[in-house]
């Protein structure tokens, strides 16, 4: 990337690529130096600032990964300042919430399963050009900011949108083309595979839809190569973190107390109350056995759930039977 300096001192690095006939420009190190990762994204005249931040320590007492994604649309991005009595901007619009979800969905599974540090991905729309949709830029910006940060992340991933105008595909369409075309398709991919598809369409042939998905996936590969280039030049080494995974020796001890066969017996009933009662009895049995071990007791419920999940998965995939006795191809 090009290095920009002021009075001989490093200011920021700039990377560019051609994407769907327009220039995608990424400035790294220009703003938000205190964030774990930040990218100032330019596409046409649309500008979005994407940042990725993570807490130093894992959050206590939770059994999920605390990721929050924010997409902020500001009135000044389209050159308007709210007038009158109320100068503040209201709560996030429906479009902003849906965009946050589309950013979250492909990225969440790429963080480590045992990571419990709070992570916030913030996308602020600074300026809007109706030819280049800011939503797409935020999706790419979040991926770049996270990839170059020191937050553990199994990326990169990239997102492409496709519209269909008069039977022709338009990659990364303008706002008008997006709203008026016959297809609104958003596809996120890693290098190996497609990881998310979001679509709305008038009726179009299945073959056309499949072609569009492949086309998005191909475009994503060029963007991923670009992100990898950025990461090689400015990426930080990933930080070590405290794993919140359930220890393997705990599972081994659980299998000694309640064998997989006994667990199968406990879940193999079509009475939900009965199944819950069986699991409660098993949990009590474990609680008694691990009474001395406070660390294990703290994660007992999650461990029992995972043991139950593995058992049901094995029953379905290997033995072709479901917990309520139905065959795998049988409908209620």
Regions found by a protein language model. Give the residues of each.
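Flexible, glycine/charged-enriched surface loops at secondary-structure junctions
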Residues: 113-119, 154-156, 223-241, 292-302, ...
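Extended amphipathic alpha-helical scaffolds
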Residues: 10-55, 59, 63, 242-332
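Glycine-rich, flexible beta-strand/loop modules in the N-terminal catalytic cores of phosphate-handling
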Residues: 35-120, 125-127, 132, 198
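Conserved alpha/beta core surface patches that mediate binding of polyanionic ligands
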Residues: 57-67, 96-105, 165-185, 332
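Short, small-residue-biased leader/transition segments that mark boundaries at the very start
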Residues: 1-4
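Stable alpha-helical structural segments in soluble proteins, enriched in small hydrophobic residues
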Residues: 106, 137-149, 212, 219-220, ...
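Mobile "lid/hinge" segments at catalytic clefts and subdomain interfaces of large enzymes
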Residues: 150-264
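Glycine-rich anion/phosphate-binding loop at the beta-strand->alpha-helix junction
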Residues: 25, 49, 103, 113-167, ...
